[in-house]
Design a protein with these regions (language model features):
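Glycine-rich, low-complexity intrinsically disordered segments
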Residues: 1-103, 107-130
Length: 130
């Protein structure tokens, strides 16, 4: 199986999981930056992005230190934490592969760094693909 490695890391004023919007797009004023690893922070890798308004980010729940790995049901807070749902029916960070998917709005691109609005990512979150 192919190993995936981060191509970038997200920079955000949110340094803990508390206060992070429950999904992307809910905090229109929250600005963050996608800072690429040096081998990807090149003009040719970003060419054409200026024609788009939004990006999909595939990222990892890197701060999830729970021992709940492998559980297939979770108690979502939106249901008061009283009902169990299958992990695939929720936005729970306790996922089999620990991957997240978010849509963000491009604000601007400067020197190989993409500034975005509306992300639900914590500072330092690894980004695996755009």
């Amino acid at each position: 199986m192919k190993e995936i490695r981060p191509i970038a890391f997200f920079r955000s004023p949110l340094t803990s999981k508390f206060g992070i919007p429950r999904q992307s797009g809910l905090a229109d004023n929250l600005v963050g930056k996608i800072v690429f690893e040096s081998q990807y922070q090149r003009e040719e890798a970003l060419r054409g992005l200026e024609d788009f308004d939004y990006l999909w980010l595939i990222w990892g729940f890197s701060a999830n230190k729970s021992t709940d790995e492998g559980k297939l049901t979770v108690r979502p807070p939106r249901l008061g934490g009283n009902e169990r749902l299958g992990v695939f029916a929720t936005r729970s960070p306790f996922r089999p592969n620990g991957l997240g998917l978010s849509s963000v709005r491009i604000k601007r691109i400067v020197d190989g760094v993409i500034e975005v609005v509306g992300a639900d990512l914590m500072d330092g979150t690894p980004i695996y693909d755009v």
